[in-house]
Amino acid sequence: MLKKTIAIIILIIGLLLIFSPFIKNGIVKYMSGHETIEQYKASDIKKNNEKDATFDFESVQLPSMTSVIKGAANYDKDAVVGSIAVPSVDVNLLVFKGTNTANLLAGATTMRSDQVMGKGNYPLAGHHMRDESMLFGPIMKVKKGDKIYLTDLENLYEYTVTETKTIDETEVSVIDNTKDARITLITCDKPTETTKRFVAVGELEKTEKLTKELENKYFPSK
């Protein structure tokens, strides 16, 4: 009886080890895809932007099964401050105020407490998963000239990618504010442990009022 119980336990552990990457990816895909910006109002976004946020860069780790399960329970829907779309690489994510493990599993995260869409430098961080179609994995394929769209449900901000580069993780000056209006997208250069970061920088080309037509075009429901 004891041997049979042990065999069952070993089998269960083995199955969990085999299927845990698929389970983990499934949870992250659900977290980052089941909600869209259309579920929010401009007044919600404005209220969320006024709240304090944490920027706990040092605590951020590679997504593990444990962190994904915790993140699924703890990510803050009241931290949503907008949405980002990069049509050329099929990125469409919510933007969360504050960088922490839970928010990074649900979308892109802001990196400074004072950043404002359409003004100065607007840096965003995102995870690079083993399934490179998820979160900021596709950003690795961004090229000069590609368009990046941001919205706070009041305006649509259109940026054009002007530069892509790989930097060391210590080069934190890329998130500093600037006089020119730009967006800076940052992710790890590979889905495993690394000290390098891939960066895509875009210049603000146009700001216009967000209409329902524009929202449906760039931020469609999933």
From Swiss-Prot:
Keywords, alphabetical: Cell membrane, Hydrolase, Membrane, Protease, Thiol protease, Transmembrane, Transmembrane helix
CDD domains recorded = Sortase_A
Q: Which InterPro entries did the record assign?
A: Sortase, Sortase_A, Sortase_dom-sf
Spell out where the chain crosses the membrane. 8-28
| UniProt effect for mutating residue 188 to A | Lack of transpeptidase activity. Does not bind chalcone
Give, as one word, the top-level EC class.
hydrolase
Which residues carry the site feature described as Transition state stabilizer? 197
What activity regulation does UniProt give? Activity is enhanced by Zn(2+) and strongly enhanced by Ca(2+). Inhibited by chalcone, a precursor of several flavonoids, which blocks the SrtA active site.
Q: What happens when the gene is disrupted?
A: Mutant is defective in processing and surface anchoring of internalins and several other LPXTG-containing proteins. Mutant is significantly less invasive in vitro and is attenuated in virulence in a mouse model of infection. Deletion of the gene does not affect expression of the genes encoding LPXTG surface proteins. A double srtA-srtB deletion mutant has no cell wall-anchored proteins, and is as impaired in virulence as a single srtA mutant.
Q: Which residues lie on this side of the membrane: Cytoplasmic?
A: 1-7
Q: Among its keywords, does the record have Transferase?
A: no
Asked if the keyword Cell wall biogenesis/degradation belongs to this entry, the reply reads: no
The record's comment on protein family reads: Belongs to the bacterial sortase family. Class A subfamily.
**Protein name in the entry:** Sortase A
What's the source species for this entry?
Listeria monocytogenes serovar 1/2a (strain ATCC BAA-679 / EGD-e)
Source lineage: Bacteria, Bacillati, Bacillota, Bacilli, Bacillales
